[in-house]
Amino acid sequence: RAVRKNLKGQAQPIKAFKPRPHQKRAIKNAVEHFITKKNERGKMIMPCGSGKSLTGYWIADKFKAKKILVAVPSLALIKQTLEVWAEQSVANKKNVRWICVCSDKSVGNISNDDVAVQLQDLGIKIHTKPAEIASWLKKRSSATTVVFTTYQSGEAIATASKKAKYSFDLGICEEEY
């Protein structure tokens, strides 16, 4: 509330981050591994706090992926990754539609006040039922589609994507250390 009061209803521009040297190397290595060498699977190993979620965002952008699945082991990591991706998408003026496949409806609530002012209208859907997810996936859009899910909800997204005859351009699977 303090941020909103100081802003007097005016949203401050969100800053688009630039990759740091280690992130630039990771992006370059991903391009070489997946695009140049045409590998279908790979690993990006980076320490905690080094910006893996942000690097994943930049890799997806570099690949020009339009249908992205981001799978993580916990609800907390969905929320953290969603905040990073949503913030940078707004900062870079990207047209994105979002859905979270998990059991916690509060995951879509962006908690960072600086970001929440501009992201409150993103309309982030939270679903667990494959039929609802499939219906959402079937809606065609020119926007980039990003699906966040926990591994625990993986079966729901697998069932939904099969039902919707929907395939992803890029899958990012994160681990917690």
Indicate residue ranges for each PLM-predicted region:
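ATP-dependent helicase/translocase motor core
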Residues: R1-P47, L54-K66, A116-D121, S142, ...
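ATP-binding Walker
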Residues: C48-G51, A76
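Conserved Walker A/P-loop ATP-binding site and its immediately adjacent core
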Residues: T55-W58, K62-S111, Y151-E155
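Conserved catalytic network of the ASCE P-loop NTPase/AAA+ motor domain
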Residues: K62-F63, K138-S142, K162-Y166
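Loop/turn-to-beta-strand initiation segments
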Residues: K67, S142-V146, S167-L170
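Conserved helicase ATPase core of P-loop NTP-dependent helicases/translocases
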Residues: H127-K139
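Conserved two-lobed SF2 helicase motor
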Residues: R140-T159
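SF2 helicase catalytic motif II
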Residues: Y151-S153, K163-Y177
